[in-house]
Amino acid sequence: MSEAVPSAAPRPLRPVYIPAVGPRLRILMWAVFVLVAILGANSAYLAGVTFLSWSSGRTYENWFYMLMFAGHLALGLLLVVPFVVFLGIHLLNTRLRKNKRAIRVGYALLVASIAVLISGLLLMRVDLGGEASSALVIKNQSARAVIYWAHIAAPLSCLWLYWLHRLAGPKIKWRYGGGYLLVTGVVAGGMILLHNHDPRHWNQAGPKEGEKYFFPSLARTSTGNFIPAQALMNDDYCLKCHQDAYKGWFHSSHHFSSFNNPAYLASVRETRDVAYKRDGNVQASRWCAGCHDPVPFLSGAFDDPKFDDVNHPTAQAGITCTSCHSIVHVNSTRGNGDYTIENPEHYPFAYSDNAMLQWINNQLVKAKPAMHKRTFLKDLHKSAEFCSTCHKVHLPFELNHYKEFLRGQNHYDPYLLSGVSGHGARSFYYPEKAVHNCSGCHMPLKESTDFGAKLFADAKQPSIHNHLFPSANTGLAWLKNSPETIAAHEEFLKAKLRVDIFGVKEGGEITGKLHAPIRPEIPTLKPGETYLLETVVRTLKMGHPFTQGTVDSNEVWLDVTVTSGGRVIGRSGGIDDQRSVDPWSHFINVFMLDKDGNRIDRRNPQDIFTPLYNNQIPPGAAGTVHYSLEVPADITEPVTVEVKLQYRKFDKIFTDFFTSKARPGDLPIRGHKPGEPYVNDLPITTLCSDTVTFPVEGSTLTVENPQVEFPVWQRWNDYGIGLFLKGKAELRQAAEAFTVLDGLKEPRRYDGALNLARVLHREGRLDEATAALARASEYTDPPAPEWTIAWLSGVINREQGRLDEAEKNLRKVLEDKTEERTKRGFDFSLDYEVIELLGQTLFERAKQVRSPADRELRNSLLRQAVDAYEKVLVLDSENVGAHYGLQLVYQDLGDTAKAAEHAKLHARYKQDDNARDVAFEKARRKYPAAARASEPLVIYPLNRPGAPGQQVVKQ
């Protein structure tokens, strides 16, 4: 019987081979490849334009670029799903392959690919609405920079890893890749080259052809043509991302600069009416519109004499976001709207009414904001020169039909020449650090969640610059019924000035014995005697004169009340029953006249002629005011003097004017009732105050006074400065004040000697002034400002005939670069008053060189004088002294054509002193209170019969 043969063991089943990329997956792969190829070409174009912008410092991104960027986002989103599906299936198909190297490289490629997708999604800033969506948006610039470069680097690493990964598979067909790169390079390169011919030209003046549309305003458009109103009135578009900035702007004086401001409306209507009756058109009023009414002006509607200044769509726009942020060039610092503005380049669909297209536009802006930022925020916007375009004016012949040039308001030049800017070498005080632009004060940082908010160096939270532009226009805020805006302006005004009851003089005369400084010692007043109260107002934190701007209608005055035992015994600055301030008060304003001696009291610029007086206080300076007080003989109780510096935006005369000119159909004016007298209830803000109680001889009552918070040396210095700035009337008293200051044992400071030198120089006592300067230079703790010492030394040396030394002094001011100047941000090379003085000195040196053998030296000095005067004109093209100097220098050089040119310009900018005297005489007869205030020496009586408030009894 045979044995059974065992059957063979079954062979193990071989695993079914799964290709890495099967037929159906290959279709998906090619779809991914096509999307990646298109994205690659698109990315090459985007990267090229970005690099071109970065390398040149110009913006080459435009509407087409943003359309391509939208395509980049769309293609990227479209790629996500097929790419992830392909990677998932491909990973499953190859996870068991034996080629571990290929698998590891594949995993690395997977990580790099995911990095591309995730970084792209993080950069998108997709906003779906709501706080949760906003929280997902990455705003931190440092984090975004890291993500951006990851998004750039990851695709490059993908290419390298893909090549390594493919070494395990079929050979790469390089000819296809080469062809793709060639076509992509040619097309993208050509498109990038076309960007190099971008028609937008920033930082240059618009064509002169635009004058026919805009003159006598100096504003220009970049094309010379009008700009559509739609482009200038797109504020709601800005609101989407800049809510806090928009809110500030909405309540600002900039927003209500135009026909939406009832005060301006009445004034500009008068200007247009006068121009139309005189010229047959309203083109003279363009002078106003370049700054106040940019939307109707730049869009072409303003020139219509029948322009509906209430209901026209552009009439209520004011200075819009685009009106400022689309300015591409400051043509000069002449003011009068001397800027160039463009129709800004927007992202695709910016003006679309379709909600989806608007959403796409918003995402493009947020994902790629560089073009938006460069278009709407340029370096010029951060400069004081930008503000000069509208905060400096002159009155041209086309407006007044009198003279080609009259200076109007001017914030810019006093700021430039102040110590605050770090450019003025002749100031009484200097800040620890210069403030290099207007926004340093008027656009303070404000915490914000706006999309454009960022963490500034000196901020604890993301912030923006305050677009309320806090300043002082409480009147307009009151008319618009905005108490929050009033409060913001009043908060801004705190600690900007101070008032100091500094001393009293016996006999009520400036020559009387001075008791000062009051506090801690208080002199005892004698019943029946007359005293002079010495009051000082000091500007503290401002870079321009107080008040500047609309100085003819700003109402700022000293309100003085003297009481004893509950009764008022002295008064100045009271308000009568009609809400008018006593005209015999001391006003810090400009009393402006027309040619017939009438006060400019309606904001009527076409009639401005000359000021009767100018009581403004320069930055870092002071004004001294004298009050005569007759102490009643029957007084038995202490005397309390309270001085308040009061501010009201408009006086009663002006509020009566603009309310009486309201027409049917106008927007309502707060407090105005047609047919009834208007009550001027505009807010009165107390800017600063001081109170002193004096003991009275014969009274046993004791008095207490709070301690003065600022040092004695400053009080003496401010008092002396105020006297010095009055001109020649009180130079002796100023010298006495500075002499006392120079003699103080504690602290020992240079101010007394230095400012005494100023007084002695003005008096012509040059040797004594030189000695005082030498004494000021000896102080070391703190040292006297070497630039001011050098300037005054140059002035004195020049007048003493030591021209070589004077030139060295003045060049030291302008050219030295010291450690202290650098640390504090000072650059006195822009002080054009010193530059002009250098030009005069060089010219005088040249005149001393008479020998024919030294002709070369003479001509060299004359050429240097020309250079100095030309530098002045770069900074102030309307400088009358520089034009006169050039006229004389060119005459000596034999250049009669240029001498005649500058003679003509000198005549244009020179004041008409003869005509001014006629207006003065007429004004003095019409306005006795103003005539008194215009005298070189003014003493305001506190016991004037009939003064408002005299009979008021304090409770």
Go through each PLM region and give its residues.
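Structural motif corresponding to the intra-repeat A-B loop/turn of tetratricopeptide repeats
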Residues: K726-K728, E763, Q800, R845, ...
